[in-house]
Amino acid sequence: SNALTTGNQYRSGYGPFMGGVIHAPYPYAYRFPFDTSQKSAERVAGEYVDYLLNTKYTAADDVAAVIVESLQGEGGYVPPAPEFFQLLRAACDKSGALLIVDEVQSGAGRTGKMWAIEHAGVKPDGLLFGKGMGGDLPMAGFVLRADLAKKIPAMSQPNTFAANALSA
């Protein structure tokens, strides 16, 4: 997960990180690398991901998945407009990449819906959850679309918490 974060406070002193990870800006005008308003930051960020995924000769020519927080956590709990996620969904569908949503900080009803991504009306291919689901217990999970989950052989992903009394 450290390869995915852009937070220097989490990366400093660790590494080397997994290769093949390309970062794109989150649509928050306050920290956006391009001079733009909040409304256009969401559109520009979505179009930039589409460009990375669907334009030949970019560094992202063989992307397996786009992983995104449905609500920016560490940057100030910023909810992007639904348009951003709709653009990501369309870009992933066009390129064949999976759209995986990180709901570790924002899921489990913390935004008024079970999952924050529901506010955008977008269905992800995968969803990561934790923190709020565990009620302060060490719980996390990953949910996939049923057609994708069926492709994973039984017991190919063992449970590393299996020996913990709380996990029984």
Where does each model-flagged region fall?
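Conserved N-terminal phosphate-binding loop of PLP-dependent enzymes in the Aspartate aminotransferase
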Residues: 1-168
